[in-house]
């Protein structure tokens, strides 16, 4: 039986992710876990996150799960979701007062920056709003096993003010337009991560989770 650990460090859409995974893999052992030994023992690991990056990283460091997650990132399929994607990079411009940046896990080279859309108009004449909140198309800029069965230009659900900017273009596998063309999906070796929420993205999102369950990087 496949065991999937959803990392519980106090920040993230845990139950919705667990429900989505249980839907596509009813025979899997899906666990929301705050235990390092369970994360190490799992076959696959999901790192969720929502809210502000500084809060997520502070909660993550306080959880005592850093080493277990870093070990998992080296040895088994890992999926980052929303702020969980941003946490994989080296640093984020979203920082607490008096700090220049928030350090990430450094598993993916690059940084996280804020939408700079002040005063910009959308094609329909309305102003862009930050955060981006709602459905948007995703262009599959590179082929990947987790895109299998997902039509290019499918809609996914986004809620975010910041986005990842990977240092290596070949690690960007999905892009979206919102005033600027930005990376919304990253992949390297056994890691795949999305800015959008697959668990809130209907059948296209469920297919991402289904592919993750069967992925053999």
From Swiss-Prot:
Domain of life assignment: Bacteria
Protein EC: 4.3.2.10, 3.5.1.2
UniProt domain Glutamine amidotransferase type-1: residue ranges: 3-217
InterPro entries with a match to the protein in the record: Class_I_gatase-like, GATASE, Imidazole-glycPsynth_HisH
Claim: Disulfide bond is one of the keywords in the record: no
Biological process (GO), any one: L-histidine biosynthetic process
Residue positions of the active site: 82, 197, 199
CDD domains xref list: GATase1_IGP_Synthase (cd01748)
GO MF terms held by the record: glutaminase activity; imidazoleglycerol-phosphate synthase activity; lyase activity
Main location: cytoplasm
Catalytic activity: 5-[(5-phospho-1-deoxy-D-ribulos-1-ylimino)methylamino]-1-(5-phospho-beta-D-ribosyl)imidazole-4-carboxamide + L-glutamine = D-erythro-1-(imidazol-4-yl)glycerol 3-phosphate + 5-amino-1-(5-phospho-beta-D-ribosyl)imidazole-4-carboxamide + L-glutamate + H(+); L-glutamine + H2O = L-glutamate + NH4(+)
Pathway per the UniProt entry: Amino-acid biosynthesis; L-histidine biosynthesis; L-histidine from 5-phospho-alpha-D-ribose 1-diphosphate: step 5/9
Alphabetic keyword roster: Amino-acid biosynthesis, Cytoplasm, Glutamine amidotransferase, Histidine biosynthesis, Hydrolase, Lyase
Record SUPFAM superfamilies: Class I glutamine amidotransferase-like
Localization: Cytoplasm
Function according to Swiss-Prot or TrEMBL: IGPS catalyzes the conversion of PRFAR and glutamine to IGP, AICAR and glutamate. The HisH subunit catalyzes the hydrolysis of glutamine to glutamate and ammonia as part of the synthesis of IGP and AICAR. The resulting ammonia molecule is channeled to the active site of HisF.
Oligomeric and partner information: Heterodimer of HisH and HisF.
Name of the protein: Imidazole glycerol phosphate synthase subunit HisH
């Amino acid at each position: 039986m496949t065991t999937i650990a959803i990392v519980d460090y106090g920040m993230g859409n845990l139950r919705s992710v667990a429900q989505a995974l249980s839907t596509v893999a009813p025979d899997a052992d899906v666990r929301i876990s705050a235990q390092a030994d369970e994360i190490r023992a799992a076959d696959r690991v999901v790192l969720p996150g929502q809210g502000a990056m500084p809060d997520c990283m502070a909660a993550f460091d306080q959880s005592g799960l850093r080493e277990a997650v870093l070990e998992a990132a080296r040895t088994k399929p890992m999926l980052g979701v929303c702020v969980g994607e941003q946490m994989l990079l080296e640093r984020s411009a979203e920082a607490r007062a008096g700090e220049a940046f928030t350090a990430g896990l450094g598993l993916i080279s690059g940084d996280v920056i804020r939408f700079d859309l002040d005063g910009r108009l959308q094609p329909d004449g309305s102003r862009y709003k930050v955060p981006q909140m709602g459905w948007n198309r995703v262009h599959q800029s590179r082929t990947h096993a987790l895109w299998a069965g997902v039509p290019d230009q499918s809609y996914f659900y986004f809620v975010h003010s910041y986005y990842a900017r990977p240092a290596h273009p070949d690690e960007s596998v999905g892009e979206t337009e919102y005033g600027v063309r930005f990376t919304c999906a990253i992949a390297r070796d056994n890691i795949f991560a999305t800015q959008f929420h697959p668990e809130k993205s209907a059948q296209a999102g469920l297919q991402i989770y289904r592919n993750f369950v069967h992925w053999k990087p």
